Amino acid sequence: MDMGNMGMGMGMGMDSGHNHSHMNMGSGHGADSGHACRISMLLNFNTVDACFLSPNWHIRSKGMFAGSIIGIFFLCVLIELIRRLGREFDRWLVKRAGVNSTCGELSSVAEYGKDGAQGGAVVRVAPRFRYVPSWPHQILRGFIYGSQFTAAFFVMLLGMYFNVIVLIFIFLGQTVGYMLFGRDTCGGGFDFGAQGRCC
């Protein structure tokens, strides 16, 4: 069989005017070709027929899209709540252990003035302690961290759909969540618990 004359183009043996609209191009989920998932790797404003994370999350109406956006917003707020709960749990562990993490010991050190004269200054030295949580507490800390990380990972995957509306609500959700639950991280002194660390 001589294949030298055969072209490898898409029109090979097909009439370009042939109508395929009667064919079901769905993936077995009962979807017809008019409601296929639209996924774009460029910035887009797709609302109806957008799909997120799986074919089951197929947006079929504007109301469904609005519900998804509201859910994404609250997922981002939830991430900040989980972070706050983790910090509060760490503070509770340190406090329960009887360790004062915000006060260090006072120490006298030499201080030299402009004229070279030596004088004494009292400074607060950072606390020197190492608190190691018990295994049950560490397992609970791990679950708190893992749930926060998992939710943040799903938000990152949602952002990779480059839907401008989704991105705006991700930014708004994280901002509102931080405004509501991030006030404990602003302090004058260094607080181990506020930094999310207990050791």
Curated annotation (Swiss-Prot):
Disruption phenotype: Exhibits a significant reduction in survival in macrophages after activation with gamma interferon. Induction: Expression is highly induced by the CUF1 copper regulatory factor in response to copper deprivation and repressed in presence of physiologically low concentrations of copper. Expressed at high levels after phagocytosis by macrophage-like cells and during infection of mouse brains, but only at low levels in lungs, consistent with limited copper availability during neurologic infection. Keywords: Membrane, Transmembrane, Transmembrane helix. One of its GO terms (molecular function) is copper ion transmembrane transporter activity. It is a multi-pass membrane protein. It is found in: Membrane. Required for high affinity copper (probably reduced Cu I) transport into the cell. Plays a role in fungal pathogenesis during host infection. This is Copper transport protein CTR4. It comes from Cryptococcus neoformans var. grubii serotype A (strain H99 / ATCC 208821 / CBS 10515 / FGSC 9487).
